[in-house]
Amino acid sequence: MRAHLGTPRVPAQLHALIADDCLGEHAYGYLGAHQPMPPQPSWEAGFRVMWNLLLDDVVASGCYTPPESDRLRELYQRHQHHFEHPVEPRLLHMDLWAQKLLVDEVGNVTRLLDLDRALWGDPEIEFAVLDYCGISEPAFWRGYGQARDTSPSAEIRRRFYLLYEVQKYMPIRVWRRGDPGRAGVSGA
């Protein structure tokens, strides 16, 4: 996929928005009107809640057994300290790829679609989504205007973020197939 030259500016502009200024509170996590989780006071707490809620969904969909989920929870606990770094709660789209951008006839990005997965947190998790979509290339980083953190702690976070992204699709696939027995949902 060939990204438009303006594409890196879109997440850079989103990431410039801080929850404190936009919401009037210092909060992390999915904080939309649908209230999927309570606001959290730190990124580590926010991601921990997100991680555990996702694992609950993966188990409910029948994709993991409870012992498999427990091993992933324990893995996070062992690496939790890597998420305890100071980071402002930035606005993250979490589903940014070419089809989510509207451009005018000369190629300027004019609209951003689908903010239903947006959250407040560490931009590094958004970069994992961009990696997954094949957007995070050297040209992206030049356009974004900030170098990527390549520290050992950032690499560990990146692996968790990528695993988080991939695991999201496990229950989605089961539940969209309409298999209520396997999904643990009655009447779906």
Task: For each feature predicted by the language model, list its residue ranges.
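Start-of-helix signal in alpha-solenoid helical-repeat scaffolds, especially tetratricopeptide repeats
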Residues: 156, 160-164
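Hydrophobic core segments within long, regular secondary-structure runs in both alpha-
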Residues: 73-76, 138-141, 186
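A cross-family kinase active-site recognition segment
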Residues: 1-77, 81-89, 120
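Active-site Asp-x-Gly
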Residues: 47, 89-92, 97-156, 168
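A glycine-centered beta->alpha junction motif in the catalytic cores
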Residues: 1-2, 52-60, 164-180
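Alpha-solenoid HEAT/Armadillo repeat architecture
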Residues: 36-37, 117, 149, 175
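ATP/Mg2+ or Mg2+-diphosphate-binding catalytic cores
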Residues: 142, 146, 169-188
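Structural helix-adjacent loops and short alpha-helical linkers that scaffold large soluble proteins
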Residues: 62-67, 147-152, 178-181
